[in-house]
Structure formats: structure tokens, C-alpha cells
């Protein structure tokens, strides 16, 4: 008789454990989906940042190439050593200024890139902290 009395308790206990396991699995699935969305968002922003940095680099290479070719054409047209010296000094000064500008642009773009790439992670952690506070 004690066996039949134990079975209903086991059934109730097993169903409660089964429900809590299902709830935990549901929470785990929700967290896994959120992490997958975070990874996708970080990947997308990283791709966009890489694209912007590549465009900036190609623009700098193009500007440098045109400056070099222009200098070469002026250099070949020089008629005296003093004119060659003046062309070299002018070219060097322009190249230094151009290099400084390109570094500033790259630095600004890199800073923007880091902010854009960290934005999804920041939002994820802010949401997680808000969820912990409400729980």
C-alpha cells in the first residue's frame, strides 16, 4: 500500500522538475538567440567599418599616386638644379601636410569605427543589467 501512495508524489515531483527544466531550457534558448543576434550585429558593424577603412585607404593611395605623378612631371620639366631643389622642397612640404591630414582622417575614422563596433555589445550588456535588476 505504501507503494501506491508513493507513486502520486513521484509523478507530481517529476512533473515539477520537468516544468522547471523546460523553463530553464527556454531561458537558455532565449539567451542563445540573443547572443546569436549580438554576434550578427557585431559582425555586420565590423564589416561596415572595414569597408569604410578600405575606402579611406584607397582614397589615400590614389591621392598619393596622383601627387607623385604630378611631381614627376614637374621634376622632368625642370630646367635648372635650383628649380629641381625648389620642386623637391615644395613636394616634401606638401607630402608632409598630406600625410598629416591622412593620419587625422584615419584616426577619426578608427575612433568612429570602435564606437560603432562596441555599440551592439554595450546595448546587450545594458539590457542584461536591466533584466537582472527587474528579476
From Swiss-Prot:
Pfam families: Phasin_2 (PF09361)
Keyword entries, A-Z: Plasmid
Lineage of producing organism: Bacteria, Pseudomonadati, Pseudomonadota, Alphaproteobacteria, Hyphomicrobiales
Annotated InterPro entries: Phasin
Name of the molecule in the record: Uncharacterized protein y4wP
Amino acid at each position: 500500500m505504501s507503494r501506491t501512495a508513493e507513486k502520486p508524489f513521484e509523478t507530481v515531483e517529476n512533473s515539477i522538475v520537468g516544468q522547471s527544466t523546460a523553463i530553464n531550457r527556454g531561458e537558455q534558448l532565449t539567451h542563445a538567440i540573443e547572443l546569436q543576434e549580438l554576434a550578427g550585429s557585431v559582425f555586420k558593424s565590423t564589416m561596415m567599418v572595414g569597408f569604410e577603412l578600405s575606402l579611406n585607404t584607397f582614397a589615400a593611395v590614389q591621392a598619393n599616386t596622383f601627387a607623385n605623378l604630378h611631381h614627376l612631371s614637374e621634376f622632368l620639366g625642370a630646367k635648372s638644379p635650383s628649380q629641381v631643389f625648389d620642386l623637391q622642397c615644395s613636394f616634401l612640404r606638401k607630402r608632409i601636410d598630406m600625410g598629416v591630414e591622412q593620419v587625422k582622417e584615419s584616426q577619426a575614422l578608427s575612433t568612429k569605427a570602435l564606437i560603432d563596433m562596441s555599440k551592439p555589445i554595450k546595448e546587450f550588456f545594458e539590457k542584461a543589467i536591466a533584466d537582472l535588476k527587474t528579476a
